Amino acid sequence: MENTKRREFSHPYTPYPIQVDFMEALYDCIESYKVGIFESPTGTGKTLSLICGSMTWLRKNKAQLAVSTASADENEPAWVLEQTIQLAREEFSRNREMLQKRLDKMRRKNMRARISYEQGFKRAKKAPEPVDDSQFLPEDYSEVIKPEVQRLLSALAPPVENDFQEPVKIIFASRTHSQLSQFVGQMQHTTFPPSSDLQDLESTKLISLGSRKQLCINPRVSHMNSVQAMNDACRDLREGKKGGCKYYKNPHDALGKVDINTFRDTTLAEILDIEDLYKLGKHTSTCPYYASRASIPASEVITVPYQILLSRSARKAIDLPVKNSIVIIDEAHNLLDTITSLHTMSITKSQVSSASSGLQKYQHKFQNRLNSGNRVNLGYLVNMLQALEVFFEKAQKFHKKETAPGTPVTTSSLFDGSTADLINVNRLEKYIDESKIVFKIESYLEHVNGETQEKSHSSSLVLSSVMEFLRQVNNPDSEGVLCFDGPTKLKYQLLDPSEPFKDIVENARCVVLAGGTMEPTGDYLEYLLPYLSQDQIKLFSCGHVIPPQNLSVQVIPNGPNYSFNFTFDKRNDEKMILDVAITLLVYSKIIPEGMVVFFPSYKYLEQVVAVWKKAKKDGKNIYEILNDQKRIFVESQHDSVEKTLSEYAEEVPKGAILLSVVGGKMSEGINFSDGLARAVFMIGLPFPNLMSAEIIAKRKYIEQSVSEKMKAKGVSAKEALEASKGAARDFYMNICLRAVNQSVGRAIRHANDYACIFLLDGRFGKPEIQKKLSKWMREGIREGSFKEALGEVQQFFASHEKN
């Protein structure tokens, strides 16, 4: 292995020691084909460490690849090998030099005719057009395509040409497009040595990929409510008889290829984010959704949202080159939940009724104008929806226990007693895909509903939801379950997220899960990567960039008058709730600037505020008294988070308190640096609802799978039962502690920042709880009486006032 002391990572700034450790560990992880779980707290420069560590490996690997390919035949004489290697290096450099010159030329052209990013382009609204009923009709449908015709069509399709291909790529995925834009912004600050010493310069070639929702520039498609309808509308335009989509450039057409190549070179000449691509597409009248794919072969880095990377069908749709790539998943603390939610669907009785009604309206209007293929399949769809309506009507008459959340439902029972169970759902699914019927029906329903935003959304989007649910139920994952979520709601839930993720792990060279709060890591090993041995996984966790004296973590087991125990059966104690207010009031007098207080749920936050406003002292309630000390702002489930945060930030210099919710809008993606959070208070342990359908189904699955594994090892039934119950409890606790880590982790943003973290609940003193907290919190955690903690906090802020 290369001497790590000699590695130069081209970090744009002088890296902290923990950043160097991170980059070294990442380089080794990629080199050794491992799956890495990397934790680097918020504010430690995680993104730049990911970029510099992976790009350094990529550039060095490209140079080594050219030499190793040329020296494959070791039986040749030394002088022949040397000459072959030299020729390979020259060819390698020549190819990249040609690409670099082409991109430099495009970059100069862009500078002379710079797109006006500041002005931007407003997304066009749908222009009113004369309505012709025929636009709502599907093409005549037939399943039969003769084999000889299919072969002829395949032979006539020319191959897509790409003049250059990078052998290994970095695929960077994150949850939101704003997070991906931040990554692109960081990438713009970096430069890396060329992969060949015969080159003077090699710019980083990055392409940002997105869905039609982010990139479609045709208003006739982009205004559609559902993904299915957008996909169908796009295909309808491209394949239709009325001129097609004017933005789509056919890669098999000479003029189309020129436009695509120009778009490709423009995107690779400079590092652009998804908004830049959208504007570029508008400026050049070129569809960025399709044209951006031409940039994939020559790119070194590809950015994608979770929805594309984590969906097999989405990866296939854009030909995402996972094979042999370095896959980096940022903000991976929510990866298990994201994979589960992407493969989880639910429908309600009202949705089915609405979809059935809309479908029958369409059928009634166009029945006599449809060919037999459309007529028959539309009839099948109506039958299936009517059967589901009957199922829900029966379910409402069941005993409450039979429809309790998490109660399994067999697929056959959905259509029991109707002819719908005789329908070939696979053929029906094929019909939905090929006929674009969802788009046609949604378009018609929008028209008849007067095209108001609310009406079109409610009457048409539900059809897509029901169709997606039927697809999922028809093609269940091996570890999924169909269950009730009350008498009027059905849920199909993925129970084993390792199955859909396995395809990525097995094909990629290296997979890195990175986040600011990856603790506790046990769930990733048990439920995401159970098929990997310990030596195939690299765990990395670093401390914070701040010195120890800049952080104080206090377990507060009791207030001035009462113990803090926010368990389900005790959290409604009004005396304890009032003691929380008194605790905040006492600390607000010694903590400068802003205090952020996290509650387990919106419902509990509302309950606490109501209690505070009810209890009065000297004519004022405790809420008003606290508000006089520091102005209180309350996160709302419905109001704009930007407005609340802006008003809070404005008040912070004078002193302010922000009451927030774990898992709410303020707990992720918002950084409370410096005065925005000189203190973070965590009120209780935010366990999820134990009686929700998701938790019940997941708990049952864990208990069953662990029990079966234990019994297979020869363990007694009693021990297997204890182990299975323990595993389910541990999973439940991990969800809670991950949420705690994520919420409090937003307080420290840079090396000179400082803050106090208060954990208000006696249970935070338990070792089994503390071991699941982030490493940087565990190292400085203190527990004492209310008075002792108050004294330490006074000293903490007094020392920072002097500095």
UniProtKB/Swiss-Prot annotation:
Coiled coil: none
Location of this chain's protein in the cell: Nucleus
Enzyme class: isomerase
Disulphide-bonded residues: none
Catalytic reaction list: Couples ATP hydrolysis with the unwinding of duplex DNA at the replication fork by translocating in the 5'-3' direction. This creates two antiparallel DNA single strands (ssDNA). The leading ssDNA polymer is the template for DNA polymerase III holoenzyme which synthesizes a continuous strand; ATP + H2O = ADP + phosphate + H(+)
Helicase ATP-binding domain boundaries: 5-388
GO cellular component terms, A-Z: chromatin; nucleus
Cofactor detail note: Binds 1 [4Fe-4S] cluster.
GO MF entry, a single one: ATP binding
UniProt short sequence motif DEAH box, positions renumbered to this chain: 330-333
Residues reported to bind ATP: 40-47
Alphabetized UniProt keyword annotations: ATP-binding, Cell cycle, DNA-binding, Helicase, Hydrolase, Iron, Iron-sulfur, Isomerase, Metal-binding, Nucleotide-binding, Nucleus
Main location: nucleus
One BP term from GO: interstrand cross-link repair
Binding site for [4Fe-4S] cluster: 216, 234, 245, 287
Family from the record: Belongs to the DEAD box helicase family. DEAH subfamily. DDX11/CHL1 sub-subfamily.
Function: ATP-dependent DNA helicase important for chromosome transmission and normal cell cycle progression in G(2)/M. May have a role in changing DNA topology to allow the loading of proteins involved in maintaining sister chromatid cohesion in the vicinity of the centromeres. Has a specific role in chromosome segregation during meiosis II.
Name listed for the protein in its UniProt record: ATP-dependent DNA helicase CHL1
Organism placement in taxonomy: Eukaryota, Fungi, Dikarya, Ascomycota, Saccharomycotina
